[in-house]
Amino acid sequence: MLARAKFRELTQRSGVDTRANRALVAQIRRLQGEAGSASTKKTCYGCLMAVGFVGAAAALIGAVATNGTDSETQGLCILGIVAGLVLGIVLIPLYGAVAKRLAGLQAQIAAKTETAWKQMEPLNRLYTWDVTVKLIEATVPRLAFDPYFTADRLASLHRKFGWDDSFNDGKSIIFAQSGEINGNPFVFGHYLDMAWGEKTYEGSKEISWTEWEEDADGKRRRVRRYETLYAHVTKPMPVYDEQKLLIYGNDAAPNLSFSRQPSGLTGKDGGLWSAIRKKWRLSRLKAYSRNLDDDSNFTLMGNHEFETWFHAKDRDHEVEFRLLFTPVAQAQMLNLMKDTTVGYGDDFTFIKQKKVNVLFSQHLNAATIDTDPSRFHNWDYDAAFAFFVQFNERYFKDAYFALAPLLAIPLYQQMRPHEDIWKDVLGREASSFWEHEALANYHGEDKFAHPSCITRSILKTRVVRREGGESTIAVTAHGYRGVERVDYEEVYGGDGKWHKVPVPWIEYLPVRRTSNMCLSERGTPSDLFKHRAAASRESAFRRSILSYLATT
């Protein structure tokens, strides 16, 4: 409902004439239908023309081949030549007419679509990066989102909650949305990671040899044999993957660490196999709880159903685990994990390290978490309305159920952090390196990549200079160049000999390139900064931050 109301508000502010746009869109849709029909006719006429002329050519070849020896066949060939030529010639003006009509329709569609874009321009200008999160804040008042991920927010995670930046090693942030729940910080992150994988390459070699064999008459003769030999080698290659996660800081249960993964039990209640599986998991937990030979202090709780589903057997502080997961928390967590009607069920990995909580959700990984307003731009008012509502409702659902495991724990909602004593150390407007990497990725990996790079690039940043709310950021793109290599593998051939089969492969060697990016988080950048940004071929205003790529 809020998304619909917000769209109506934006429409009213924009002054867009919705009736005129609907009428124009109806004309465009009608023209698109006519263009589709004309395109189909053009294709059919073209195919029939080709059939006619190709058939005539084939008949001509047949007539020449008979050379008058078969009068009946030659007569049929002549008939085919005439029929093919008549068909092709008759269709030429029809094809030309429909092609001309199609071109005219396409020109009309382009002109009217441009007019429709101009009609919608006042509305398209009103979309902002925070329009989606403002709707969530209005729906859930205890949630507050930051305009961008500040250094202040990151410092709070470091100093108050013990967050470690080692997580970011070898990763590049694509998008980050920070905020707080009841004063406790959280960050949604979308990042690019690289890991070494393997690729199998194939090579081949043709061989031949001579053999003697007896024919049906018992005579010996020489025959030539041929065989293709294949060989394979497996070599390392960089594999890139994008992931999304949620980081949350809370002082509750500060000495407790645990991890759990999706149980695989969602949607399997009531079946025999499900009952057997749950019973087996519970028996394993009971055996683990009774084992006194290891260093674990794991003690099974009375709620066996919760233990079976949540399955956090690596917890290291039983008292704080019970303090965190009260009977109410257990019930709410079970409801969350079982529900696939409204929510996504048990699709989340939950890792708690002292005061830091990290969650990975399958649905979040498939979701869109960036709020780029350009995605709402449209020339069709009704289509824009439908997409705006659908996107924002889906965004709310994805974000809410990513946060739901945290919201299911009452103690997390009761704990509010003390006033952040570090909030003035770096200044509230300074953006964090997460935001710098996201900005660089927004400009595009290709803008920073090494010229020899043939893979994706991991973009890492550092602040070179900061003065008066304006910063120079060094962006280093880490990628790999490819060097062609050849291995020779010995393969046994049908000739009874070993052959060296060449297998070409690519060796990936690291390359990097550093470029400068300038940015200003201030609402009103200096005139000099704005002039330089305007002069740059690559500038962007994103989430209250104006940035441009400096020439080198």
Enumerate the predicted regions with their spans.
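Transmembrane alpha-helical hairpins and terminal membrane-anchor modules
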Residues: 36-116
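Generic detector of bulky aromatic hydrophobic side chains
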Residues: 79-82, 86, 116, 396-404, ...
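Short alpha-helical interface elements
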Residues: 56, 63, 134-137, 141, ...
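Long C-terminal extensions of eukaryotic subunits of large macromolecular complexes
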Residues: 460, 468, 472, 476, ...
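N-terminal topogenic membrane-targeting module
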Residues: 21-24, 93-204, 536, 545, ...
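N-terminal targeting/docking segments
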Residues: 27, 69, 257-260
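Cytosolic juxtamembrane N-terminal segments of multi-pass membrane proteins
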Residues: 1-43, 541-545
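Structured extramembrane domains adjacent to transmembrane segments
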Residues: 156-437, 442-446, 450-487
